[in-house]
From Swiss-Prot:
The record marks H18 as: Transition state stabilizer. One of its GO terms (molecular function) is ATP binding. GO terms for biological process: coenzyme A biosynthetic process. The keyword Membrane does not apply. This is Phosphopantetheine adenylyltransferase. HAMAP family: PPAT_bact (MF_00151). It is an enzyme of class 2 (transferase). The gene is coaD.
Amino acid sequence: MASIAVCPGSFDPVTYGHLDIIRRGANVFEQVYVCVLNNSSKQPLFTVEERCELLREVTKDIPNVTVETSQGLLIDYAKKKRAKAIIRGLRAVSDFEYEMQGTSVNRVLDESIETFFMMTNNQYSFLSSSIVKEVAKYNGPVSEFVPPEVEQALMQKFKG
């Protein structure tokens, strides 16, 4: 049986930190579904479709990664894909506290799907999509934080 994992997130926008987790997950699992979700508590800069397109562009060199979106519960999406794992990236202890809540709920909904936490590489431990958007909004350089395709998309969003 193939080892399948889901790597969920809002990815608004995708950063090098996200890509680090996706690449490392793809080295562990035979198939990784990157699932773009809408976080109802956030106002997204990019539409779900734009985020999916950017993710497809920056992961096109990773053959076992597929980018999709889902409107429902993450656990239902994971079951539909026959995933046995959910991959979550952690930057700091504060991330763990938040992720633990979601993991606990997912365990109640389906205890057969495990959550794997991956620590981001140190160079990305401070990085968040919110910080990237804030820097880009004021025309600051973001090339150290995001791939060129994402940098261009950010420039387009904030230029007008």
